Amino acid sequence: MAISTTKPSLLPPVPQRLFSRHDLIPPRQDVLWRIERGAVRTVTWSEQGTLITLGYWGMGDLVGQPLSRVVPYQIECLTSVETSIVPPELWHQTIDSMLSHIQQSEELLSIIHRKPVSLRLWQFLVWLAEKFGRDVDQGRLIDLGVTHQEMAEVINTTRVSVTRMLQQFEEQGMLLRHQRRLILCLPIQRFRM
């Protein structure tokens, strides 16, 4: 982990920190973390130890304990991540990012209540494609490695069910696999929420 000071686009100079894949970003009460590069997920777990995914966050998003009342609360790096520390005196300058945080949380909440589970998985893939994807010749590449287990945790099903549904989507021509990534093959407009 390295610390440096740089100047993000709209904020005065703030300390930056680098984290490696699988690192945990400290959930401090006194700062928010702006994701400058990379992707993280926020999680908690139930009394029985079941992992509960709260959100997936990427470039420009804010995360941090001050945005959540959930305890326990953990920020896990899914890739190498560069963050800026945003202290409370600068929070008023982050309203757009905070609104985006709320909107994304509500989008995920609506996805996890979809039925049947296959629709829930498909809508989650669409959401990932919109947030972390890029256009390629075959469709929209989800440029984030999300495991079948991680997908299962988000949509509240089993890893085996996710694997089976992904195979069905592939057989139906809805997605392709490319170097451990997924490509959604239908035009994005056809399967938006």
Provide a role label for each language-model segment.
Residues P15-L24, S46-V63:
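Short acidic-glycine-tyrosine-enriched beta hairpin
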Residues Q29-W45, G58-G60:
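Glycine- and acidic-residue-biased ligand/ion/polar-headgroup-sensing regions
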Residues I52-E107:
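Cyclic-nucleotide recognition modules
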Residues F132-M193:
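Phosphate-/nucleic-acid-contacting segments
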Residues M1-R37:
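Regulatory nucleotide-sensing modules
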Residues W33, I75, M174-L175:
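A structural signal for short hydrophobic beta-strand segments in well-ordered beta-sheet cores
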Residues D96-T157:
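Polybasic "coupling" helices that flank or enter modular domains
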Residues R37, W45-E47, S68, P87-P88, ...:
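Surface loops and adjacent helix of pleckstrin homology
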